[in-house]
Design a protein with these regions (language model features):
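Structural alpha/beta surface segment adjacent to cysteine/selenocysteine redox centers
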Residues: 1-84, 162-163, 174, 186
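C-terminal cap of thioredoxin/glutaredoxin-like
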Residues: 6-11, 81-189
Length: 189
């Protein structure tokens, strides 16, 4: 949801350049096969391997297209067992990258890219992480925002500008409140 908010409502209005980075909750939460959510986290982790294969072969730009296709299938179609090769071809990418799904060699680049976000945002966070350059040009990142729907265009920009203001204040660290509703993904894009 946060990705949809930033890409659809904020990026063009605030001249943002989006580079998709992986975060594996399997690695972040140090999951083992004994953990109940392990199969779900393993599946999404393997999807990240495919994304890193794509990035290595053709650069950052198509990674976003694949991310959206994954999201359409998982969140809108409720298909958590889709064929990754089908998702690749749906966005014009070579299905050969599907082999990365089972290839543990892609775990190293996932860990390396995750480490950058975690170093900037902190260890006690999850996903999403938004990284940016502050008003002094220093790299910063924060966890969130966690939202259940994409705000209106005006509210989206207000929220972004408010977050950027807060994140530029030294000594500011955290806001939180209990979530009381489930995400509303809207129509399938």
């Amino acid at each position: 949801m946060t990705a949809r908010w930033v890409v659809d409502e904020v990026a063009a209005e605030r001249d943002l350049r989006i580079t998709w980075q992986p975060i594996s909750l399997l690695f972040k939460n140090e999951m083992t096969e004994a953990d109940e959510p392990y199969p779900r986290y393993l599946k999404t982790h393997k999807m990240l391997r495919v994304m890193e294969s794509v990035r290595a072969a053709v650069g950052d730009a198509p990674v976003g297209d694949l991310y959206w296709e994954y999201g359409r299938r998982v969140h809108h179609d409720q298909d958590k067992d889709f064929d990754v090769a089908d998702a690749l071809t749906a966005v014009g990418l070579d299905a050969v990258h599907a082999a990365a799904f089972e290839d543990e060699a892609w775990d190293a680049p996932i860990r390396e890219r995750m480490a950058v976000g975690i170093e900037l945002a902190g260890e006690d966070i999850g996903t999403p992480i938004i990284g940016f350059h502050d008003r002094n040009g220093d790299r910063r990142a924060f966890f969130g925002p966690v939202i259940t729907r994409v705000p209106s265009p005006d509210d989206s920009l207000d929220m972004w500008d408010s977050l950027m203001t807060l994140m530029n204040i030294d000594g500011f660290w955290e806001l939180k409140r209990t979530r009381t509703e489930r995400p509303d993904f809207g129509e399938r894009p």
